[in-house]
Amino acid sequence: MESIERYSSLPSGAPRNFIQGSYDQLSSTSRVLHPEEIVEPLGFHYRNDMIMDFLPGVDLFTGQQIMVPAALALFRYSPKAPAVNPFAFHHTNGLASGNVEEEAICHSLCEVIERDAMSLAELRASAIPFHFLKHIMNSLKAKGYPISAISADTFKDDPGIFPDVDISEIEFEPAKDMANKFSNAGIPLIIKDITSTVGIPTFNASSIEWVTHDYGYLAEGHGTHPDSRIALLRAITEVSQTRAANIQGARDDLRKINYGQDNTDDKRAWQFMPSKNTIKFSEVRTYFNEDILEDIKLLLDHLKGDGLATAIIVNLTNPEIGIPVVRAVVPGLETFKITKSVMGHRAKRYFKIE
């Protein structure tokens, strides 16, 4: 399914009826998503009179059509002049497929909520505390105090912000079986509850397996779903997938272990360090629905309840393949985990220096 997602999301993956024009031109007659409404880094200074390619999407809150910059909907999109692409990155966040369109929509919404939670967790436990420390150091230096520099590769994250989740008593057999495989292999598995203020269960799963005294496999996975059991299973299966890819060496974007003595990620990265707080899996809020439409409604209600008023779906289905593929775009959700470069209003709530 993932290969179908990727192919269908390419500019050449299906017939594309681009609507070309500037924001100023199109917004006079249509609803248009402005590039600055979303949390994405721009590659250059954007102006509203710049020509771009757009694709039609649907706002799930209103049912109305909204024009979306093609660069946000498609993967590896490069415009032809005179159109421009102001965005600095391309990625697959919010891209999902399903047996039916409703399933694809549910998966896509869960993914953007998951990436938002991941971004906020990374910022709160690592990036923002490091910035605070650097700010304090620079202030002391400016006052003439002799302060030694601290580098990012020696900074220790805060592992106590997000609780570890005890899954020893879980009764959901698929997740229980997966966790037992780690236990039987002697590989530690750490589960953290990183659910954001959106309120949809989200977990971070991690493992470190030392092969020798200075070589090991480090893996991380995430999962989000209204049903906390499914969210947990997704996180564990993703960390398993990452481990397999790491062992195989088939990707070039996997996280590397710093092999310096006493400076490995299991001693300084929040995802891999035990938390001071532990909760039972049964304490995590969960939602059970028999109809996937009810799951979608729940996701939308939670987004709206957290101040996110627009949720756009762009249909990217290739008619020859016939497998529903969509891209979800929710203005306001964070993407720092992907881009490592920008923060939106949700992240900035935690970024205050008195």
Regions found by a protein language model. Give the residues of each.
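Helix-biased "structured C-terminal domain" signature
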Residues: 1-354
